[in-house]
Amino acid sequence: MYQPPTGVRDLLPLDVSQKLWIEQRLQRVFTRWGYQRIITPTLERMETLQASGSVDLQAILQLRDAEGVSLGLRPDPTPSLARAVATRLADAPLPVRLSYQMNVFRSTTQPQEFYQAGVELIGAGGVLADAEVLLVLAECLAELAPPDWTLILGAVAFTRSWLAQVAEPARHRLRRAMAELDRVAILAEAGIDEAVRSQLLLLFDLRGEPEMVLSKASSLPMSDAQRAELAELETLTGWLRGRSVPVVLDLSLVEAFDYYTGLIFEVSAGGRLIGRGGRYDHLLGSYGKPAPGAGFALNLEALQQVLLPTGKLPGRTVGGGFLVVPDGPDAWEAALAEADKLRCAPGERVEIELLGRTGEEAIAHGRALGAAVVRWVHPDGSTTDCDLAVIQ
C-alpha cells in the first residue's frame, strides 16, 4: 500500500543527481552538433499515435479527457516529434535538428515509465545523414564511456524482403521470433516455404565483423535495392571504424516499432541494450509533410545501471556549500542575512539549520548533508566556521 504502481518508480535525490549527470553530458554533445532541444506533450491524441500505423496499440496507455477524446501517453518520442515538425515547424529550413530528454510510457504485461534522450535529424536522407546520426551517438558514448559499448547496425528493408515472402499472420510471428532471436519458433512455424525458412535461419548467422557479414550476404540472391542497402552499410561501417567506433553488423536485426525504412541500429554496453534508432523516411508523410528522417534514443536508466560500477556517476547528492547555524534564537535574522549573502555566489549551496542542532550535532548533520563548511552565525553578525574537510 502507498507504493507507486507496478512498472514505475520514485527517483530519489541520488537517482536524480546521477540522471542529471548523464543528461548534462548528452546535452553538451547534442548542442555541439547543432541539435536544438524540444519538449512535446506527454499526452497525444490517439489519432496522432495511430497515424503511421506502425505503433502497436497494445503498447499505448490510453485514457479519455472530459470531452471523451481518446488520448494516449507517448510510447515513443519520434511520432510526437514528427507531428510537431509537420505542423508547428512546417516552414522551418531543412534539415531540422532536434534533441530531447523526456519520459515515455509503454504497456506490455504491465505499465512502464522510463526516460530517454536522443536526437532526430529530419529533412535529410542518404548515407551522409545516417552517418551524422551515428557519429552523434558515438560521440555521446565516448563522452559517457560506458564499459564495452558496441554499435550494432542492421538494414530493415533487407530483412523485411525475406519476411515479405510469408503471408500474415505468420509474418508477424516470424518477425517477433527474429526480434527475440528465437530459432525454435522459426523452425516450428508451419505453412511456409522451406527455402524461405532456410533464408530466415541464415540471417541469424549474418552477425559479426562487417567484412565477414557482408561477404556471407553477398552470396544470397538479392534485388538491386538490397545490394544498394548493403553497399551503404559497407560505407557506414568503413567511416565508423576509421573513427575507432566499435561496430558489428546484424542483418537479422528488427525493431519493435514498424516505421523504420532503412538503416536500423542498437547500442549495447555492459551486457545491456542502452539505445536504438534508425531511418524512418515515411513517418512524416503520415502527418501531411513527407520528409526523410533518422534518429536515436538512449535509455537513461539503462545507462545509469551500466555506469554505476565504473565510479563515474556521483556517489552522493550534490555536496559542498554551507550549513548555516544560528547561534541561539537571537541570531536568526543575522543567520538569514548571512545565508542570503552566501547564496549570491553563483552555484553556491546554502542550507539553514532549522531544528536547533548545536555543537557536535550540527557538525554531524553538516557532514551527513555533504556540506563543506558549518558556519555558526552569532547575534552580532559575526561568524565562526568549521571546515569539515579539515576535521574529517
Curated annotation (Swiss-Prot):
Pathway in which the depicted protein is active: Amino-acid biosynthesis; L-histidine biosynthesis; L-histidine from 5-phospho-alpha-D-ribose 1-diphosphate: step 1/9
Subcellular location: Cytoplasm
Any single GO BP term: histidyl-tRNA aminoacylation
Gene3D superfamilies reported in the protein's UniProt record: Bira Bifunctional Protein, Domain 2 (3.30.930.10)
CDD domains according to UniProt: HisRS-like_core
Cellular component annotations (GO), alphabetically ordered: cytoplasm
Keyword DNA-binding tagged: no
PROSITE patterns per the UniProt record, alphabetical: AA_TRNA_LIGASE_II (PS50862)
Coiled coil: none
GO molecular function terms listed in the Swiss-Prot or TrEMBL record: histidine-tRNA ligase activity
Note: This function is generally fulfilled by the C-terminal part of HisG, which is missing in some bacteria such as this one.
Function summary: Required for the first step of histidine biosynthesis. May allow the feedback regulation of ATP phosphoribosyltransferase activity by histidine.
HAMAP family, A to Z: HisZ
Family of the protein in this entry: Belongs to the class-II aminoacyl-tRNA synthetase family. HisZ subfamily.
Subunit structure: Heteromultimer composed of HisG and HisZ subunits.
Name of the protein this chain belongs to: ATP phosphoribosyltransferase regulatory subunit
Lineage: Bacteria, Bacillati, Cyanobacteriota, Cyanophyceae, Gloeobacterales
Gene: hisZ
